[in-house]
Amino acid sequence: MQHPWIEICPGIRRRTHTHGRTMYQQIAELEAGSKMPAHSHPHEQIVHILSGRMKLIVDGRAHDLKTGDSFYLGSNVPHAVETIDATRVLDTFSPPREDYLAADQSASPPVLQD
């Protein structure tokens, strides 16, 4: 099943890649210069940079990430994102993002295509 692209903040969209009983993966595409404000969630998260460059700000400290880099975020750790270049990310969450799966189900057409 092809899941829809869903904008999560200006210049940042995500699409469910795959999920199971205990894990969830999404692809996120971030336009150059886009920002995701500080937030936290009860899920553990691994951010893997497929392409591009971004800053991941964790507890006020910026971590420069580029193609091939990965970063682990524990549960409830505040973090924010600032992109330097257009960036494509594979995010893995545990437990699954039930909120994102519900949003996938309620997304209305048209569905953005690659």
Question: How should each PLM-predicted stretch be described?
Answer:
Residues 37, 46, 61-63:
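Short, surface-exposed secondary-structure edge patches
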Residues 1-23, 102-114:
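A short, N-terminal "cap"/entry segment at the start of jelly-roll beta-barrel domains
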Residues 9, 26-40:
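Conserved short histidine dyad/triad with adjacent acidic residue
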Residues 50-51, 66-67, 85:
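A cytosolic small-molecule/anion-sensing beta-strand core signal
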Residues 43-54, 59:
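Glycine- and acidic-residue-biased ligand/ion/polar-headgroup-sensing regions
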Residues 75-99:
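Ligand-binding loop in jelly-roll beta-barrel domains
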Residues 35-37, 71, 75-80:
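Histidine-centered metal-chelating micro-motifs
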Residues 60-75:
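Short acidic-glycine-tyrosine-enriched beta hairpin
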